[in-house]
Swiss-Prot record:
It is found in: Cytoplasm. Component of the eukaryotic translation initiation factor 3 (eIF-3) complex. Residues 1-142 form the MPN domain. The lineage of its organism: Eukaryota, Fungi, Dikarya, Ascomycota, Pezizomycotina. InterPro entries: eIF3h, eIF3h_C, JAMM/MPN+_dom, JAMM_MPN+_peptidase_M67A, MPN. GO terms for biological process: formation of cytoplasmic translation initiation complex. GO terms for molecular function: metallopeptidase activity; translation initiation factor activity. This is Eukaryotic translation initiation factor 3 subunit H. Pfam families: eIF3h_C, JAB.
């Protein structure tokens, strides 16, 4: 509840905080949390390429390390589980796959404990009626590649690292505390109303009090074909991510063309130098060095493929969300297929 309240209050800006608990028999039990204070990073600071939103970089900020240790010490004094088991962040429309989340989780798994997790609470999706709370860890293969900063095409082909291997999602189960469970059992149940007589006709059923008061009554509004605004926004974000993917692809293709041009120039220079050395050898003159091209030519540096991997993972995230939301609209479209397409009958 603390996590959901904090994320909802700061929405749509990013909210981050620390989670504490215990590791019991291989199960990570989260029992408490507290938010991180937002540290204003000065403009001249270059700490980890600090993001425009200071809250997104708060979990790995040096100023919050002391704050986190002090909070855990005070929790321990009041006999609360005070083992740091990870951190949490808010998300909007599932857009949590970014460099800030990667760097924060890498910091926790490297500096604190490899079993720490990142809890992601999607405020927008939770507002649709179902709680969205997911837990992630960075995979060991991605941790190794990120530590060595090896995200070139050659290294990715050698290691077989794909965008699906960035995160390892863990199952999440939510339980009430024993005090809340005991309180719920003590609540009085409402009195069961006496059974009512069945309506004699359809007209009596439609005009009766049951239709006006119950949400289970037949309602033609449920057949409306209006598109959910949440689904529409997800489609827009998916298109933006696809455009970003095309931009990254064009940048990499530009690098490949530049590399091919430089390699052709180097090959032509080496061929010319070999001919010159052959002529000088025939004249018994000293040969010229053939490795001088390394000083004369500079090969373009291959751009990192990390951003492309993260964007591909974000596209996959949006696609999964859209797939989970189109089921209701698709069912309605098939229900009225016979009326939309004249000449066809439903089979």
């Amino acid at each position: 509840m603390k996590i959901m309240k904090h994320c909802s209050q700061t929405f749509p800006t990013t909210a981050t905080g620390s989670i504490v608990g215990m590791d019991v028999g291989g199960t990570l039990e989260i029992t408490n949390s507290f938010p991180f204070p937002v540290v204003e990073v000065p403009p001249e600071s270059h700490f980890d390429n600090a993001a425009a939103n200071p809250a997104a970089a708060a979990p790995r900020a040096k100023a919050n390390t002391v704050y986190q240790a002090e909070m855990i010490r005070m929790l321990r004094e009041v006999n609360v589980d005070a083992n740091n088991v990870g951190w949490y962040t808010s998300a909007n429309m599932g857009n949590f796959v970014n460099m800030n989340v990667i760097e924060n989780q890498f910091f926790y798994q490297k500096e604190m404990n490899e079993r720490t997790v990142a809890l992601v609470h999607d405020v927008s999706r939770s507002s649709q009626g179902s709680l969205s709370l997911r837990a992630f860890r960075l995979s060991p293969r991605f941790m190794t590649a990120f530590k060595e900063n090896k995200f070139t095409s050659e290294e990715l082909q050698k290691s077989g690292l794909r965008y699906q291997d960035i995160f390892v999602e863990l199952p999440v189960e939510i339980h009430n505390s024993h005090l809340i469970t005991s309180f719920i059992h003590q609540l009085q149940t409402p009195n069961i109303p006496a059974p009512t007589d069945l309506p004699p006709s359809l007209a009596a059923l439609e005009s009766g009090p049951f239709v006006k008061s119950s949400i289970l009554a037949p309602n033609y509004d449920n057949l409306t074909l209006s598109i959910d605004p949440f689904l529409e926004k997800n489609c827009d974000l998916l298109l933006d991510s696809i455009e970003t993917h095309h931009t990254e692809t064009n940048n990499f293709q530009y690098y490949q063309r530049s590399l091919a041009r430089e390699q052709q120039r180097i090959s032509a220079w080496q061929q010319k130098r070999k001919q010159e050395n052959a002529t000088r050898a025939a004249l018994k003159q000293p040969l010229l060095p053939e490795d001088e091209w390394q000083r004369l030519f500079k090969l373009p540096q291959e751009p990192s493929r990390l951003e492309s991997m993260l964007n591909s993972r974000q596209v996959d995230q949006y696609a999964r969300q859209i797939d989970s939301f189109v089921s209701s609209t698709t069912g309605k479209m098939f229900a009225v297929k016979g009326n939309l397409l004249p000449g066809e009958t439903a089979k």
